């Protein structure tokens, strides 16, 4: 129950940080940072699963998910590569470190979360 409550709090807080383009920034709590697609896809996946499991309110989260998914597929090129994927990152308390990270189009750790989303959408 405690884990589910933490999950709901996280999903609720993500609502406040969704950027105008529909996705989330490299620093989630700063909408001025560049859009990061792999993390955004993970958030979409978590929201879709939450709605389908009955943990999240569909009327609240479906519009966010729809906006994010439409934005996310706009980052997939003709070869199926996804842009805006942050290179592998260790953790630090230095915000600038995260802002200076490079993006790697086609990076496989960006592909997987998008495939998770597709799978979640297709599940009944």
Regions found by a protein language model. Name each.
Residues 23-31:
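Short linear capping/connector segments at secondary-structure termini
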Residues 1:
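A surface/extracellular/periplasmic glyco- and lipid-processing/surface-interacting theme
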Residues 34-35, 39-124:
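CBM-like carbohydrate-recognition segments
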Residues 4-23, 64-81:
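Long, well-ordered core segments of solenoidal/helical folds
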């Amino acid at each position: 129950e405690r884990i589910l409550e933490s999950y709901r709090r996280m999903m609720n807080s993500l609502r406040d940080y969704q950027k105008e383009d529909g996705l989330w920034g490299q620093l989630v709590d700063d909408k001025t940072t560049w859009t990061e697609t792999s993390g955004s896809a993970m958030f979409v996946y978590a929201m879709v699963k939450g709605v389908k499991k009955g943990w999240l309110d569909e009327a609240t989260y479906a519009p966010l998910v729809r906006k994010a998914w439409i934005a996310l597929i706009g980052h997939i090129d003709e070869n199926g590569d996804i842009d805006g994927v942050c290179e592998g990152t260790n953790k630090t308390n230095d915000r600038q470190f995260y802002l200076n990270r490079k993006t790697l189009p086609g990076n496989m750790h960006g592909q997987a979360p998008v495939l998770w989303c597709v799978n979640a959408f297709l599940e009944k």
